[in-house]
Amino acid sequence: MIYTVTLNPSVDYIVHVEDFTVGGLNRSSYDTKYPGGKGINVSRLLKRHHVASKALGFVGGFTGEYIKTFLREENLETAFSEVKGDTRINVKLKTGDETEINGQGPTISDEDFKAFLEQFQSLQEGDIVVLAGSIPSSLPHDTYEKIAEACKQQNARVVLDISGEALLKATEMKPFLMKPNHHELGEMFGTAITSVEEAVPYGKKLVEQGAEHVIVSMAGDGALLFTNEAVYFANVPKGKLVNSVGAGDSVVAGFLAGISKQLPLEEAFRLGVTSGSATAFSEELGTEEFVQQLLPEVKVTRL
């Protein structure tokens, strides 16, 4: 079973405004909303690949109810923990440029987190737990390490799609998969990475430090997969960037869908990269049909 963890989910409110004026009254030409959060995105994409998962995390208030209802209508299994306060709202303002205003989210108490952590005692050997997104400010910086340790005690596999301070300690958690982009990879080693060639030695280091699989996304330049045995490169299909939100999560979901379907590793990687592109070229998360349409354009080569 695949479990996704979103500690600080959101309702993403996307507003399109033409001729935006700062300090004046603006009217949207189009707006929509849907559940946000990297783990939730992974669950939603897995569903589109016909792979089951269960979404975990903290929700509260009317916005939390919206998320649960929305995912229920998509036939997604959830086991969210209820907290006081409202799940945050993140505003994505599209005016030609894209501006984001992210809410803080509710306070999570020590008791809330302790009860949440107990869920992982029921994991089975071989289960996959995806830890994705930001850590709420009310939780300690080592929150992901605590969850990863609880997973390891049950011989479950951990996937990390995280950033910031938590990413710096990612390899200590011995993840089954981690997925930094090239900027994050550079930050981990105190350097700037601008090309595939520059990324290769640092991706290899992450494997040497304990990660089983590492996918490094290089935006329009493709993506790299590192394992103990080999390094693979995948190009990305041509298309217009429409949506940067959720593309990396889609790579994770596509790769895990391929693993769940017991595809060869290169094919799972190819499915992941294509899934990321399908989302990047869409207003929302990419559909299965769009992924299949783009799949022939993506080629995987061993470096």
Swiss-Prot record:
GO cellular component term, pick one: cytosol
Family: Belongs to the carbohydrate kinase PfkB family.
Taxonomic classification: Bacteria, Bacillati, Bacillota, Bacilli, Bacillales
Organism: Bacillus subtilis (strain 168)
Enzyme class: transferase
Gene name in the database record: fruK
One Pfam family named in its UniProt record: PfkB
Keyword Transferase: yes
UniProt GO molecular function: 1-phosphofructokinase activity; ATP binding; phosphofructokinase activity
UniProt keyword rRNA-binding, yes or no: no
Catalyzed reaction equations: beta-D-fructose 1-phosphate + ATP = beta-D-fructose 1,6-bisphosphate + ADP + H(+)
UniProt-listed Enzyme Commission number(s): 2.7.1.56
Protein name per Swiss-Prot or TrEMBL: 1-phosphofructokinase
Catalytic site: 249
Protein residues bound to ATP: 248-249
SUPFAM superfamilies for the chain: Ribokinase-like (SSF53613)
Alphabetically ordered keywords of this record: ATP-binding, Kinase, Nucleotide-binding, Transferase
Database matches in InterPro entries: 1-PFruKinase, Carboh/pur_kinase_PfkB_CS, PfkB_dom, Ribokinase-like, Tagatose/fructose_Pkinase
Role of this protein: Catalyzes the ATP-dependent phosphorylation of fructose-l-phosphate to fructose-l,6-bisphosphate.
